[in-house]
Structures are given as structure tokens and as C-alpha cells.
């Protein structure tokens, strides 16, 4: 996928014309592949293999840094299952940061952990991920910022939502894996 939908909702048309049948819609951040351009329109194919035409001004190139994309959500409240500025959970934050960059990754922390490549602590770099949990599965995930700091969505006493902070001492013993997507 080489571009993203850059507007809240973009109509996908059967032909490159505003009056053509609307076949589906793209949502902001949705990645698409451009197959052809014609007079201000782009023939696209979605990540779900759906073809159609979208106005070129409703698309933008894929670029950026997942940390910067995640920072868009700083201050958003924690919401289990959430994926918007109105509320977002830890794995939703990671999912949406990558989605804004045109990468569709799994939604939940345990699935994200399974999709990542293991990293040794000595090789940990900004943007890598730390998973946390007890027993056999990851239940929390955070971006590593470096210098002992993480970026995540959390809900605990005194903290609610997306924050950048020094890795809390109560989380450190729950570390499961260090991964890179």
C-alpha cells in the first residue's frame, strides 16, 4: 500500500466522476494502492482488494514515524477497545499509529507481540515495542522512547489515557517481550 486516505471519509466511485455510483468509502488513514491516475482521480485498490476511483486530493503519501503518529493521541482518555481521540487503549494506540502510516497490523497486544520480531534489550531503539502481561499472553503494550521512557495508553491510579512517562516500576516486572514491527 503506497498512499493513505487523508480525509475523514472519501467516496470510492465506480468511474472517475462525482456522479458515478458510490461503491464504498475510505476512512481517514486507510491504506490503498494507486493503480492509475486520470484527470485528478486515482484508480485505487484497498487493502481488502476492493477497486474504485477516488479524488487524488483525498489521498496522501505514506510517510512518517509511528511515535509521532501515536503522539497525536497524547491526552486522549483510556478506553478499552477504543481507537479514537475520544478514547483509546494500549493496543489500539499501536494499531492506529501504524495504520496512519499505511501498515495494517493486528489489533490486540498479544497478536501484535506475535507479529513482531524479538529484540534484545541491548538492541532496543526508539519505536520498538514492549509487551507486558502475566501467564501466557500479553495484556499491555507500549512504545519504547529511549532513556527509560515509554509512550502508551494506560488506566491506573492517578493516570488515565495516553502518556509519555518513565516506565512505571510496577510494569517493569511484567515485561514479556521486546519486539520490532
Go through the PLM ranges and name each one.
Residues 1, 17, 30-33, 38-40, ...:
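Boundary regions of SH3-family modules and the immediately adjacent low-complexity/disordered segments
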Residues 1-4, 68, 83, 145-181:
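Aromatic- and glycine-rich peptidoglycan recognition patches
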Residues 24, 50-52, 140:
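Short beta-strand segments
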Residues 103-165:
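...with weaker cross-activation on analogous glycine-rich loops/strands in unrelated enzymes
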Amino acid at each position: 500500500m503506497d498512499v493513505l486516505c487523508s480525509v475523514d471519509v472519501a467516496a470510492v466511485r465506480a468511474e472517475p466522476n462525482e456522479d458515478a455510483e458510490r461503491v464504498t468509502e475510505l476512512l481517514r488513514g486507510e491504506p490503498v494502492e494507486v493503480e492509475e491516475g486520470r484527470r485528478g482521480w486515482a484508480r485505487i485498490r484497498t487493502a481488502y482488494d476492493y477497486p474504485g476511483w477516488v479524488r487524488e486530493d483525498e489521498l496522501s503519501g505514506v510517510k512518517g514515524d509511528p511515535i509521532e503518529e501515536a503522539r497525536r493521541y497524547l491526552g486522549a482518555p483510556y478506553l478499552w477497545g477504543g481507537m479514537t481521540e475520544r478514547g483509546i487503549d494500549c493496543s489500539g494506540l499501536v494499531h492506529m499509529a501504524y495504520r496512519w502510516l499505511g501498515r495494517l497490523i493486528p489489533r490486540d497486544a498479544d497478536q501484535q507481540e506475535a507479529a513482531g520480531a524479538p529484540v534484545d534489550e541491548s538492541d532496543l531503539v526508539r519505536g520498538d515495542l514492549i509487551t507486558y502481561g502475566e501467564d501466557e499472553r500479553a495484556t499491555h503494550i507500549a512504545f519504547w522512547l529511549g532513556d527509560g521512557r515509554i509512550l502508551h495508553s494506560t488506566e491506573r491510579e492517578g493516570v488515565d489515557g495516553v502518556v509519555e512517562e518513565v516506565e512505571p516500576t510496577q510494569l517493569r516486572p511484567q515485561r514479556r517481550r521486546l519486539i520490532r514491527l
